Amino acid sequence: MRIALLLALLVPFQAPADPVVTPTAPIALFNGHDLSNWEADIPARDKDPGLRPSFVIRGGHLVSLGTPEGHLVTRQQYRDYRLESQYRFTGKPGNCGLLVHASVPRALYAMFPKSIEVQMNSGHAGDFWVIQEDIEVPDMEKRRPRAPGEKWGGAEGDARRILNLTDGSEKPLGLWNTMVVEVRGRAITVWVNGDLVNNGVNASVDHGKIAVQAEGAEVEFRKLVIGPLPPV
């Protein structure tokens, strides 16, 4: 019992598993006031609980401060949805991402939850990074480069990055970007500022939690809304 309680405190978003929700109306994942819909997993805080928070609310925005590195994860699991985010880098360009289908925490490099990342890294918004999961795209040989002897996959040492279609859809630094992610079954489609930037199929998973990264750069989010899919 004592061990189970300790594990729950260390990795609160792993268990118990919540029912999987398919949205029927728009839901604001961030309510503008608090982080009651989220749980943070910041590995460095295991050894130093006094570290500053990685995620704060400032001026009505959700802010990923970038460090200490980690993830802010929804309490709820979702499937078949449209996720719209509006974000901007506040200082220097840098790295961040939205993770969909998040499940097992710290599944890669003792940091990243098992998931499929939709990249927000400056200049590369819309790349996929697979984390102990997988997905396929057209032109795999071209868009998923691998070194000799390297295989496609989501584990350490695998070719995990899948290049986007544009690398030119982001707005200048400091301006707000809109990223839309649609999840239909095992397909994931991504738009940045109206441009189609990625479309993957045959994902290894079709549901899970949603996570925001703290990965070195400060990023503000003024909108994180999940809702039903539009008609095809």
What are these regions (language model features)?
Residues 15-232:
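Carbohydrate-interacting regions of secretory-pathway proteins
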Residues 3-12:
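Sec-dependent N-terminal signal peptides
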